[in-house]
Amino acid sequence: MAKIVVTGGQALHGEVHISGAKNAVLPILCATLLADAPVEISNVPHLHDVITTVKLLSELGAEVTIDEGTLAKGRSILVDPRSVTHQIAPYELVKTMRASILVLGPLLARYGTAEVSLPGGCAIGSRPVDQHIKGLQALGADISVENGYIKATSNGRLKGGRYVFDMVSVTGTENVLMAAVLAEGTTVLENAAMEPEVTDLADCLIALGAQIEGAGTPRITVQGVERLGGGHHAVLPDRIETGTFLVAAAMTGGSVTVRRARPDTLDAVLDKLTEAGATITTTAESVTLDMHGKRPRAVNLTTAPYPAFPTDMQAQFMALNCVAEGVGVINETIFENRFMHVNELLRLGADIQVEGHTAIVRGAERLSGAPVMATDLRASASLILAGLVADGDTTIDRIYHLDRGYENIEEKLGALGATIRRIA
């Protein structure tokens, strides 16, 4: 099984280009099932989860063509959904990726039936699918869970309705939003997720002919249409990848510019980096961070739904606090079991105490390289970041988690001066 070896001690300097957002491209690929003509998606990142989604679309009968593109143009995927013949998403594909549940709404709305295996993905606590089910039931769907599958049917077109999410759910909002696009009448979604990836999905749907207002706010209104046509959409840049590279620069005392970024989606993260002592300069599509060779200051943070601090950046900032001046307190309010990276950071010499959903991190002047194991996607990123500042070699096992969410991370870090390599 592949591993990554990081040799610490190098400050990062230079420029890096940000890839398309993992959490935007997956629902957008699923949304192509709603159309009755080919849809082209560009700025698609090279990620394992994208490959899994393409396999799933192909399994359903869609014709999928991948254009690898160039460094400047990027990768694009053309999906022709007119050949879809199956409405069952099998366990073999769904078990590796939670986002597979996002075919439920589109299949149900377009074909009146869908069977989707209960999802897998990162093992970071119970991420219930009840918000998806309740939301679709509010549109008139008949849903049962049998033998590990969610089975949904509708009698004719779904009917517009009002649904108030019990809790903010990004994928729940996306699934119900996609279904509502082809429902008869008006749908109002309250307490909807406001994440930029939800807005990007809505922008894609609008480009295909949907009528949506309020995406990016807690109240989304959808006027159902009879059909969606073909079209093109470019996926927005990945704010979590952007944040990860900025934290890497901050931890190593370096100076890095990230390009093809969207700093307007990163306010909470940029505020914390400024608090840590970084000088931040932004343009519409770039962020420059300069630590002037200094050690970062510890920061306190609490994860919460957008526009607050993202849970997907929590592990990276914990790594930063491990080598910062002072004590940082991190409160995780989104997912349970999302401190699984703590034990691995302790192996590198970190000083962390966990009390329930709170981690107290006392900064150490140095970390020491050691063999560690990735437990989920963002935890694997935090271990690489810690390895960048640890003495000696840090060997990270189970990096298949990393390939689910970061495109060529070792090449990108290497271009900034990191000593990092992948081994078999």
From Swiss-Prot:
Alphabetical UniProt keywords: Cell cycle, Cell division, Cell shape, Cell wall biogenesis/degradation, Cytoplasm, Peptidoglycan synthesis, Pyruvate, Transferase
Catalytic activity entry: phosphoenolpyruvate + UDP-N-acetyl-alpha-D-glucosamine = UDP-N-acetyl-3-O-(1-carboxyvinyl)-alpha-D-glucosamine + phosphate
Domain of life: Bacteria
Entry binding sites for phosphoenolpyruvate: 22-23
Catalytic residues (positions): 122
GO process annotations (BP): cell division; cell wall organization; peptidoglycan biosynthetic process; regulation of cell shape; UDP-N-acetylgalactosamine biosynthetic process
Localization (cell): Cytoplasm
Binding-site residues for UDP-N-acetyl-alpha-D-glucosamine, renumbered to this chain: 98, 127-131, 312, 334
Pathway membership, UniProt: Cell wall biogenesis; peptidoglycan biosynthesis
Transmembrane parts of this sequence: none
Molecular functions per Gene Ontology: UDP-N-acetylglucosamine 1-carboxyvinyltransferase activity
Listed EC numbers: 2.5.1.7
Keyword Cytoplasm set for record: yes
Gene Ontology CC: cytoplasm
2-(S-cysteinyl)pyruvic acid O-phosphothioketal found at: 122
UniProt entry tagged with the keyword Cytoplasm: yes
Function: Cell wall formation. Adds enolpyruvyl to UDP-N-acetylglucosamine.
Family listed: Belongs to the EPSP synthase family. MurA subfamily.
NCBIfam families according to UniProt: murA, PRK09369.1
Entry protein name: UDP-N-acetylglucosamine 1-carboxyvinyltransferase
Species of origin: Xanthomonas campestris pv. campestris (strain B100)
